Structures are given as structure tokens and as C-alpha cells.
Amino acid sequence: MHSPPKPEDVRELTPTDVNELEGFDGIMFGVSARYGGIPAQMKTIMDANGGLWQNGKLVGKTAGVFQSTGTMQGGQESVAMNCMSFFAHQGMVFISLGYIDPKAFSYEEIHGGSPWGSGTYAGSDG
């Protein structure tokens, strides 16, 4: 869908980087949908947080989600809800955007997003 490349100063989190999460006040997770659920890469990062969980290092930190799906009804809300279990187990505080933009109630054009988080449609080719 002709999206621009990722800016150089935006880092991608890998399972070996998860201990860095401890140093942040809040974390926004950008998650794509795979058949209505979170992709394996995101699940791997979540599963790598055992040490942080065991020591309560993410307790009280704020968390949010923005998501991308290939199509309408592609799982934007279910992706956000799938992240809730991780946030709850870590003791994180989920911050929702709610319906802050009046465009959420407009049906004149196709757009993503929900009270669970900001969203977009990437098309079937990602």
C-alpha cells in the first residue's frame, strides 16, 4: 500500500533486547495481525520476558497497542485483546486511546482503529 520505509531511528525489539524494557516508563507495541492473532515474532518477544516478570520489572509501566491488519475485520481488536494477557501478567497498565477522533464515526472512507488502539489496513501484501 505504498507505505514509506521505517525511519532509521526507530528500533525493532528482538527477544535478546527485552531487558531494555525495564528502562522505559511506558511502551507502545506495534503489532501486525496474523489470521486475527498476534504473529509468532511478537509472541516470542512476550515469552522472552520471564526474567522481567519474575522480578516484577514491568509492574506499573504503561502499555498501549497500535495494530495493522491486511483487511477490514482482519483482527485489529483481537490483536489488542491478545496483548492484554501479557500486560496483566506483567502488572502493566493498559492505556486505551478510546474514541478520541471523530473520524471513528465516519463511514465516508475506510479506516482502521478502535477504542483498543490505533490501527491501519496494510493490504494483503503487508
Predicted feature locations:
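Short amphipathic alpha-helical segments at helix-loop
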Residues: 30, 68, 124-126
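Short, surface-exposed, charge-dense and proline/glycine-enriched linear segments
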Residues: 18-25, 88-95, 124-126
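Short, glycine-/small-residue-rich phosphate/pyrophosphate-handling segment
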Residues: 59-112
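Glycine-rich phosphate/pyrophosphate-binding loop and the adjoining helix
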Residues: 9-13, 98-126
